[in-house]
Amino acid sequence: MSLLSDLINLNLSDTTEKVIAEYIWIGGSGMDLRSKARTLPGPVSDPSELPKWNYDGSSTGQAPGEDSEAIYTHKPFQDPFRRGNNILVICDAYTPAGEPIPTNKRHAAAKVFSHPDVVAEVPWYGIEQEYTLLQKDIQWPLGWPVGGFPGPQGPYYCGVGADKAFGRDIVDAHYKACIYAGINISGINGEVMPGQWEFQVGPSVGISAGDEIWAARYILERITEIAGVVVSFDPKPIPGDWNGAGAHTNYSTKSMREDGGYEVIKAAIDKLGKKHKEHIAAYGEGNERRLTGRHETADINTFLWGVANRGASVRVGRDTEKAGKGYFEDRRPASNMDPYVVTSMIADTTILWKP
């Protein structure tokens, strides 16, 4: 095993300028990540230098199989697994004719974020990505007794100790790997349900928020693969008196961050309320199991906002209210949401939509 480890950790720059690029794209379910690697002649300083590639969409549930789907490169990150000059590359997928395939949500998001009115507002996002670690063979949360349940919620949120925190080595490895990769990860914490954790990405501007969340999810999938643990983004992995898993999305525009921004925030929240059903429909599959009005959520059928209210659909922080400017938190997105969809939809509703 030591020889295998030595070979995995070879520093290619000792003998060659060649680098390995791992191309990452989203599969047919809209949540499954796929990737494959190719050799490049040397380090890449700009995404435009990365060649387009292709893949068999019939094997990812994305095409009938007569032709190969194309993947276009967008955002490179440093590869924390191969290290050196090797990179991970976030891509999106197209038909051979150049049309975005149905699971390519980045293409439409990029159109929203390139709109001059949106560009002028410099939208910031901070996404709180929750997830649950599962024992591989039984698909049951890490640290839970087989076929049984731990003690009730209370001691696990930000908890410390072998009977409260399960999988911290995975969480910390992921945290450091994201920083190494160049992802703007801003923190981690243990969540209310044991075996559940959260990482935060942001503040990130526009389309980069989606790129960074998907890259962070990919790195987490790779680390749990190594650890022999399954990561679940199900919004309610365990029924009953247990917290679900969300992806609270913090948001601000230039106008909100400036003096008088609180009025802009309230106007934006009013718009979100008027499009509540449309947003809920796009905020993650199975979210109705999570948004019940219990466990720090609002009821899925009701739009409610408030200051410092964790049971609201949209929450405004006390600091924002006091300063008269800042940001707000959309608490509705599920943990399995597509960040391209959620971020662009919030921008579209609050900036571009005219009721």
UniProtKB/Swiss-Prot annotation:
GO function term, MF aspect, one: glutamine synthetase activity
Keywords assigned by UniProt, alphabetized: ATP-binding, Cytoplasm, Ligase, Nitrogen fixation, Nucleotide-binding
Compartments where located: Cytoplasm
Pfam families, A to Z: Gln-synt_C
GS catalytic domain residues: 105-355
Something else known: Irreversibly inhibited by the herbicide L-phosphinothricin (PPT).
Protein known as: Glutamine synthetase cytosolic isozyme 1
Organism placement in taxonomy: Eukaryota, Viridiplantae, Streptophyta, Embryophyta, Tracheophyta
